[in-house]
Amino acid sequence: VYQLLGNAYDEIGQSGKAVSIYEQGLKKFENAGCLYLELGNMKYQNGDYKNALYYYEKGIEADPMFASNYYRAALIFFASTEEVWGVMYGELFMLLERDSERCKSMSRELYKIYSEEISFGRSGAEVDFDSPTIVYSNSSVRPNLFPESFRSAMRAAVRGERILDLASLNRIRQRFAKEFSANSSSFENVLSAYHQELIAQGHFEAYNYWLFGYGDPKQTASWVNANKTKWDSFLAWFEKNPISINPSNVFSRYTME
């Protein structure tokens, strides 16, 4: 009700009244992810991306199964120098909102980001999912060391590869999951735990093709056609085993501190 009423005020140009309605709603429903989303959207429309992220990430923590806050936060980080948070939020979004048009769009975006942030030259592979410069934080220092831990594991994972396509990206992520689990125990999170479950069930390769499939549909179709039994087995398991995120295991920048 508060979301609809606030949206109605926003549509007739009364953005201040809309914000007031959303804030009133949060006083009564403090875990309403949809209201955090709307407050974030209001900030985003005004170009205030730092405070938009504040609301989106508060929404993620308050209502961790509500997908849209992950989606909006991911898009902001994709346009920043801290893409690491974008790829984490983007993948979690896809797990929560499967098979929608936004999910397909996120698949393409994730593949694009991985392709841009992993590069190959004469001296080997380069990984650049984050920058020492903080773009969207009020802190004078980086909020936590998760990005460095992510990059370290990714650098180890890309060794030996010369190109990036779906097949090599799967191999990289297989090695990354092992490396991250072994050396970044303090940053274990709901997504890395889900990866370990997929690996244990033998479905991680198929999952990676599902995750990035819309980034290269031809390559995906070729793999699926050659691995139909493996693909069908993954889909059956995937349907019965959705990710479960709650306040005790929710992933955000600030739960990684």
Regions from the PLM with identified roles:
Residues 32-34, 67-68, 101:
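Helix-start (N-cap) detector for alpha-helical repeat units in TPR-like alpha-solenoids
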Residues 24-25, 58-59, 93:
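Canonical positions in the second alpha-helix
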Residues 3-4, 38, 72, 109:
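Canonical tetratricopeptide repeat
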Residues 81-102, 108-118, 125-129:
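TPR/TPR-like (Sel1-like) alpha-helical repeat modules
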Residues 28-29, 62, 96:
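Structural marker of alpha-solenoid helical repeat scaffolds
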